[in-house]
Amino acid sequence: MPRMTQLDLIRNFSIVAHIDHGKSTLADRLIQLTGTVAERDMKAQILDSMEIERERGITIKANTVRIDYPAKDGRTYVLNLIDTPGHVDFAYEVSRSMRAVEGSLLVVDASQGVEAQTLANVYQALDAGHEIVPVLNKIDLPAAEPERVKSQIEDVIGLDASDAVLISAKSGLGIPDVLEAIVHRLPPPKGDREAPLKAMLVDSWYDAYLGVVVMIRVMDGVIRKGDRVKMMQTGAVYGIDRLAVLKPQMVDIAELGPGEIGVLTASIKQVRDTRVGDTITHEKKGCAAPLPGFKPAQPVVFCGLFPVDANDFEALREAIEKLALNDASFTYEMETSAALGFGFRCGFLGLLHLEVVRDRLEREYDLDLITTAPSVVYQIYMKDGTLQELHNPTDMPDLTYVDHIEEPRIRATIMVPDEYLGDVLKLCQDRRGIQLDLSYAGARAMVVYDLPLNEVVFDFYDRLKSVTKGYASFDYQITGYREDFLVKMSILVNDEPVDALSMMVHRDRADMRGRAMVEKLKELIPRHMFKIPIQAAIGGRVIARETISAMRKDVTAKCYGGDATRKRKLLDKQKAGKKKMRQFGKVEIPQQAFINALKMDS
């Protein structure tokens, strides 16, 4: 069984890149070239284990692989690669993966240049004190402009890119240079073997056979199979059943020393018991203080998930419980809706996280789901001095008791080609944005805006992509809460409020949102035998109304000629019947109407 490795022969690194700049392909090539995985087992995106990761071409969970590399100087180095997500929703996964390694490869597409997410992740790498090696990928494309992109890296990020490694991950060109750069330009880890054990919990996932598998980076001390270890945040103590390194499959190892990255299993039942970023130490003679920088992931966007068929509720509950085993940042609680029946109110890190969870539920568990409009967490300050958090617009307290409402704001960074800048600025202004900064890097503008998160969760990303023909890239950080004039808008169908369609809106945009919603519902709800009013209301005041006219039977058809009062009598009788029908009749709103109404383009 392999023993631990000397510190000066270890290199821990991550790959930082925007979506689609070739990060997972580069990881594949490094694994392939060093023979870590046999040729027959190789497949594209080998580190992306979820089907949805391969299909969308994105990395969601941080994955790791240990590569043995015989360098040109005659020594064999151990390279630990942590493949991090590139998307903003998973920024916490990125931040703690960054703390587990000492260096980063910054991969930039030589034809596209620096994008917004590249920036966000590079800043995290710099915060973690990384040495960064720039790598220009896709240099064999006809549109590649390595010199322009090098100067862009220097202008926008401030990194010296003169000795950037030029590669094509797809064809394998330049990959040996990357391996040499990792060995010679990235620093070895520091650590003291004799000190008490201090290891950082980088990630954890649920395995049907092993229970929870925990990925750790040892900072100080040595961890061995059979040790009893303690999680410093939760105080839980476990005995280690198995220690291994990932190549990407598990290979057992006797011990892990400073600077090494590996996995352990210890009969842990739930992923929730292992807080990512937590510090692991020995139960006896443990370290004095935990590692800094731990914070539990907070859900930011909430929405309701309901089964289309009410009989699927139990299946949905089981699916959500299984999914939550593997995703500690996803929260859920039961809720009932008069319109949609039983379902769950779920919390997510962001919109992509929401989409990924919904897709996984539908695909892996074969469910049909309705998603209610996403909402953010509002802070409601009451007149009696108390503070309430509002996750669901239907729970909004009576306005007479409310002093003011605060909403979360974000700092959005948008990189956009110059010719689309005007459209992007207009979009941000329409969404109540405040411009903070505007700068240029070559032919691309970088705009920084302060925006309300509420305006972004709905369809901001889709609108941004459509006004820039897909060329803009967008990244955000949540900055805090600020007071604004927010109101709850209810939708009434036949004078009955429909809870699933109520939403929080800004007072200035309420009329427009309300009008758009009632017009859309008028198209979607089928006609009934009586007329149906559809209203958007704030409190008791109706701000928009449409009426679906009734279907009408010709009751006077059998009156040929004759007295007009005879016809009048029949029409009055029909009218009275319709009035009674409207009073007692129930309006059937088809499920498809909900789905389409919630997709509403604002």
Swiss-Prot record:
Gene3D superfamilies: 3.30.70.240, Elongation factor 4, C-terminal domain, Elongation Factor G (Translational Gtpase), domain 3, P-loop containing nucleotide triphosphate hydrolases, Translation factors
Top-level taxon in the UniProt lineage: Bacteria
Chief place of localization: membrane
Reaction equations catalysed: GTP + H2O = GDP + phosphate + H(+)
Topological relation to the membrane, as annotated: Peripheral membrane protein
GO CC terms: plasma membrane
Binding site for GTP: D20, H21, G22, K23, S24, T25, N137, K138, I139, D140
EC number in record: 3.6.5.n1
Keywords: Cell inner membrane, Cell membrane, GTP-binding, Hydrolase, Membrane, Nucleotide-binding, Protein biosynthesis
Domain tr-type G: from-to ranges: 8-190
Localization in the cell: Cell inner membrane
Pfam families: EFG_C, GTP_EFTU, GTP_EFTU_D2, LepA_C
Gene Ontology molecular function: GTP binding; GTPase activity; guanosine tetraphosphate binding; ribosome binding; translation elongation factor activity
Cross-referenced InterPro entries: EF-4 (IPR006297), EFG_III/V (IPR035647), EFG_V-like (IPR000640), EFTu-like_2 (IPR004161), G_TR_CS (IPR031157), LepA_C_sf (IPR038363), LepA_CTD (IPR013842), LepA_IV (IPR035654)
GO terms classed as biological process: positive regulation of translation
Keyword hit for Protein biosynthesis: yes
Purpose: Required for accurate and efficient protein synthesis under certain stress conditions. May act as a fidelity factor of the translation reaction, by catalyzing a one-codon backward translocation of tRNAs on improperly translocated ribosomes. Back-translocation proceeds from a post-translocation (POST) complex to a pre-translocation (PRE) complex, thus giving elongation factor G a second chance to translocate the tRNAs correctly. Binds to ribosomes in a GTP-dependent manner.
Similarity comment text for this entry: Belongs to the TRAFAC class translation factor GTPase superfamily. Classic translation factor GTPase family. LepA subfamily.
Protein name: Elongation factor 4
Species assigned in the record: Cereibacter sphaeroides (strain ATCC 17029 / ATH 2.4.9)
